[in-house]
Swiss-Prot record:
Keywords from the UniProt entry: DNA-binding, Nucleus, Repeat, Repressor, Transcription, Transcription regulation
Organism placement in taxonomy: Eukaryota, Viridiplantae, Streptophyta, Embryophyta, Tracheophyta
GO BP annotation list: glucosinolate metabolic process; mucilage biosynthetic process; regulation of DNA-templated transcription
Gene name of the record: DF1
GO CC, one annotated term: nucleus
Domain Myb-like: 60-118, 401-465
Miscellaneous comment in the UniProt entry for this protein: Plants overexpressing DF1 exhibit very short root hairs.
Subcellular location: Nucleus
GO molecular function: DNA-binding transcription factor activity; transcription cis-regulatory region binding
Composition skew (Pro residues), residue ranges: 363-376
Protein name: Trihelix transcription factor DF1
Biased composition (Polar residues): 381-408
Length: 603
């Protein structure tokens, strides 16, 4: 007992004396149980509050026999629990004894179960469980006996020595009850006749040192009241003796708890949502500010680019206007410049001979001509060809803008070219190069809104005239609504007037020089290169009209765009025509009969 209780030797001796001499053992156990309960409530309250977290609500239910065995073991060890300051080893002993009875429970579970049973007993006794009577708890008898034994033992220690026999009788009755309940052996009733005088003071001192009855009642009442809300649920669930009112209270507590928990969760969610919305609004505002600043910068950049483009366009327009004004001044000054001197007279006979060969085929041999040396006409032909090539290849100073213009000419532009060329035809009939003529035509086209230089105008004129020549020389009859050569009527009218003029000049020149008469069935003048020289007296005769080019191109039946073709096709045709002219396919020089007669006479 000294090892379990941990008390002083004097106290142990006094307790032994009281137990063996004056009080029966069951009564001392009951008194010790009350004191031990008060000490357990005082010392282990903090431990219980911490261990409830690990145990949780509910737990494993204890059978009735196991609970009764726990109460019996705890009642037997009441003195040890009363004297011990550390209760851990004592509960380990309780757990070991429970294992001996066949119940496997650790010290912690045993301690918790005893505390819950005792607290529920106090509540039922005080009427705080809502029951009609306090004696409805199934362990009420055992706990009440334990409590009554503790109270009786304490009162016995407080009374005087003469009253001990009466206490013994009462204790005997109580012991009988306890023996019937706990199945304990009967107490020892032997009373010592004399007691040492020294044993009484320690006994009295042992009784007066702890004031456990008052402490246990007050402390346990306060402790059970303060912690009833935290332990009521677990004790009710373990005991299972609650009524409908208890269940309602328990449900009400759970409802309040969950409502408070849900309110906290909802408040937290609302706070998080509010912060989230504030962050989203802040980011949206920042994005709008960035977009607005970017939009302002873009507008400023576009305005700057527009201003720069407007300045460039104005500068380009000013430059173009200055260039146009300069070109107009040059075009106005060029026709007034003095005309260059005509070529030597020996070139004219060959040119006139070429025109006569194209206009009329000879029907009869020409009249005798005065003798003339042969090398002179040949030289004239060569010089004429060279001059023609030089004039056709002239105007080499072509501007890049003109070369970049489109190769295809619209119908309106071609009609404007024909009109300008027709109007200026009479002005440039005199001898001289045709460069000023095409410069003036180019200036006129530019005034009409067509950007074509002199070389392009000249090439286009030659191409459409060549195509007109092919259509004219074809044997097929051209219908009135034909789509080929849409400028046929304009060019035909132009050349009819020109043929009349040239025919009159040729007749006058031939009659004055050689007395030749123009035949009636003369062929109209076909188009020739632009370098045409005035008619002159020649000694050469033309070949029959049968000396035509071997290859004749048929008129095209394509549409307007296909009829005109590109400039490259026309350039190929120019080369073919020049090759034919150089080969002398259209005319040849033949010595006259007069020269032959004179040679014969000389011989």
């Amino acid at each position: 007992m000294m090892q379990l209780g941990g008390g002083t030797p004097t106290t142990t001796a006094a307790a032994t004396t009281v137990t063996t001499a004056t009080a029966p053992p069951p009564q001392s156990n009951n008194n010790d149980s009350a004191a031990t309960e008060a000490a357990a409530a005082a010392v282990g309250a903090f431990e219980v509050s911490e261990e409830m977290h690990d145990r949780g609500f509910g737990g494993n239910r204890w059978p009735r026999q196991e609970t009764l065995a726990l109460l019996k073991i705890r009642s037997d060890m009441g003195i040890a629990f009363r004297d011990a300051s550390v209760k851990g080893p004592l509960w380990e002993e309780v757990s070991r004894k429970m294992a001996e009875h066949g119940y496997i429970r650790n010290a912690k579970k045993c301690k918790e179960k005893f505390e819950n049973v005792y607290k529920y007993h106090k509540r039922t006794k005080e009427g705080r469980t809502g029951k009609s009577e306090g004696k409805t708890y199934r362990f009420f008898d055992q706990l009440e006996a334990l409590e009554s034994q503790s109270t009786t033992s304490l009162h016995h220690h407080q009374q005087q020595t003469p009253l001990r026999p009466q206490q013994n009788n009462n204790n005997n009755n109580n012991n009988n009850n306890n023996s019937s309940i706990f199945s304990t052996p009967p107490p020892v009733t032997t009373v010592m006749p004399t007691l040492p005088s020294s044993s009484i003071p320690p006994y009295t001192q042992q009784i007066n040192v702890p004031s456990f009855p008052n402490i246990s009642g007050d402390f346990l009442s306060d402790n059970s009241t303060s912690s009833s809300s935290s332990y009521s649920t677990s004790s009710d669930m373990e005991m299972g003796g609650g009524t409908a009112t208890t269940r309602k209270k328990r449900k009400r507590k759970w409802k309040v708890f969950f409502e408070r928990l849900m309110k906290q969760v909802v408040d937290k969610q609302e706070e998080l949502q509010r912060k989230f919305l504030e962050a989203v609004e802040k980011r949206e505002h920042e994005r709008l500010v960035r977009e607005e600043s970017w939009r302002v910068q873009e507008i400023a950049r576009i305005n700057r680019e527009h201003e720069i483009l407007a300045q460039e366009r104005s500068m380009s327009a000013a430059k173009d206007a200055a260039v146009m004004a300069f070109l107009q001044k040059l075009s106005e000054k060029q026709p007034n410049q003095p005309q260059p001197q005509p070529q030597p007279q020996q070139v004219r006979p060959s040119m006139q001979l070429n025109n006569n060969n194209q206009q009329q085929p000879p029907q009869r041999s020409p009249p005798p001509q005065p003798p003339a040396p042969l090398p002179q006409p040949i030289q004239a032909v060569v010089s004429t060809l060279d001059t023609t090539k030089t004039d056709n290849g002239g105007d080499q100073n072509m501007t890049p803008a003109a070369s970049a213009s489109s190769s295809r000419w619209p119908k309106v532009e071609i009609e404007a070219l024909i009109k300008l060329r027709t109007n200026l035809d009479s002005k440039y009939q005199e001898n001289g190069p045709k460069g000023p003529l095409w410069e003036e035509i180019s200036a006129g086209m530019r005034r009409l809104g067509f950007n074509r230089n002199s070389k392009r105008c000249k090439e286009k004129w030659e191409n459409i005239n060549k195509y007109f020549k092919k259509v004219k020389e074809s044997n097929k009859k051209r219908p009135e609504d034909s789509k080929t050569c849409p400028y046929f009527h304009q060019l035909d009218a132009l050349y009819r007037e020109r043929n009349k003029f040239h025919s009159n000049n040729n007749i006058a020149a031939s009659s004055s020089s050689s007395g030749l008469v123009k035949p009636d069935n003369s062929v109209p003048l076909m188009v020739q290169p632009e370098q045409q020289w005035p008619p002159a007296v020649t000694t050469a005769t033309t070949t029959p009209a049968a000396a035509q080019p071997d290859q004749q191109s048929q008129p095209s039946e394509q549409n307007f765009d296909d009829e005109e073709g590109t400039d490259e096709e026309y350039d190929d045709e120019d080369e073919e025509e020049e090759n034919e002219e150089e080969e002398g396919g259209e005319f040849e020089l033949v010595p006259s009969n007069n020269n032959n007669n004179k040679t014969t006479n000389n011989l």
